[in-house]
């Protein structure tokens, strides 16, 4: 550690690489925190977690008992064990006893991306509600045609305040906070929509995953989806071609090259004669193929591409990377796939097998450096390498199925919740405070041996 600090002072390593090195070291040492504890007020499984995008300080949770709570991640409300364990109780909670509370389970709870003055909850009681954080009162509500599975708002929107809602209905609805009405609906799925995710590179692009196994890309400024992901369409044909000159070919003698020169000249003369005839035919053929492709991809026409599937089952989770280049998806077939957003192709990253819940949606999250994917896998949380698919971390601590993963990039902490009604904190191990505690414990020990 001190050597790295010295290298940073002398200029041997840059500041960003120095910070990334320590962040990656902290993330790879995540373990169940013995210094921070959230006191959960929920009496049902916790289905949603999110840290606010402005300060990274307030944690919002939604549970199956119809309650939503807000926690302060940085400031503890109480201390135990001589100040070693920080207890974080909720700042306030909204439950069924509230006059505007939800009657049934809350499936999604998200922050308003601009500030912490508003938050949004979606419930199985067919309502989506917008809450004022300061007064804990519902200011806007939207009546949905069915159970609300997932809600999302764009973190980079400057021209709209739309909430995308995925319900058990086949249509995705966009709710406008400013007008208090539905902006428009997106039709294309053949079953309920279990996951929605906004693009991190464009405020107009929305990704949806349905129970029909399809992942659709929408531009909300136009009618119809402009892309349907197909798990059989891979990047194999889009990779750079193999170089013709190999190591063996480069060792050919000059005599052999000269002998082949005459044959190559004859071939070039023949190709010039036949090339002029074939160019016209090939150009017309390419044009016809491109026209047919455009016709098939057109959103208003039914085709085989429109019925493509990304998973053999429902799409239970979606997560776009922070750079906006890749999309992660999880399905009820217990598969995780990484998609290239620009081409819409499967990158064929082979994530190691793990059981994923099939009857409800899950919440994925990612870290940038190192590039990890945190996935709820039944009672455990697995961190996969985004490019290798290998299991880097396996976190055990929940007694029942894990529903959500929420990574706090400011403190390099991971928050998870499950059907055991608990919210657990996973913090980096090997910190200076942990070493001090170990030293104090070692001083209290005697020197007697057994």
From Swiss-Prot:
**One GO term describing the cellular component:** nucleus
One biological process term in Gene Ontology: transcription-coupled nucleotide-excision repair
Mutant lacking the gene: phenotype: No visible phenotype under normal growth conditions, but mutant plants exhibit sensitivity to UV-B and decreased DNA repair activity following UV-B treatment.
Q: Which residues form a coiled coil?
A: none
Q: Where is the composition biased (Low complexity)?
A: 271-287
Disulfide bridges in this chain: none
Query: Annotated region Disordered: where?
Result: 269-298
What keywords were assigned to this record? DNA damage, DNA repair, Nucleus, Repeat, WD repeat
The WD repeat units are at 41-81, 101-141, 148-185, 188-228, 310-349, 397-436
Q: Which SMART domains match?
A: WD40
The protein's matches in InterPro entries, at most eight in alphabetical order, are given as: G-protein_beta_WD-40_rep, Rad28/ERCC8/Ckn1/ATCSA-1, WD40/YVTN_repeat-like_dom_sf, WD40_repeat_CS, WD40_repeat_dom_sf, WD40_rpt
Fetch the Pfam families from UniProt: WD40
Q: In which tissues is it expressed?
A: Expressed in roots, leaves, stems, flowers and siliques.
| Predominant place of localization | nucleus
From which domain of life does this come? Eukaryota
Q: Give the subcellular location.
A: Nucleus
Does Nucleus show up as a keyword for this record? Answer: yes
Q: Could you describe the subunit structure of this protein?
A: Interacts with DDB1A.
Q: What does this protein do?
A: Involved in UV-B tolerance and genome integrity. In association with DDB2, is necessary for repair of UV-B-induced DNA lesions.
Q: What is this protein called?
A: WD repeat-containing protein ATCSA-1
Q: From what organism does this protein derive?
A: Arabidopsis thaliana (Mouse-ear cress)
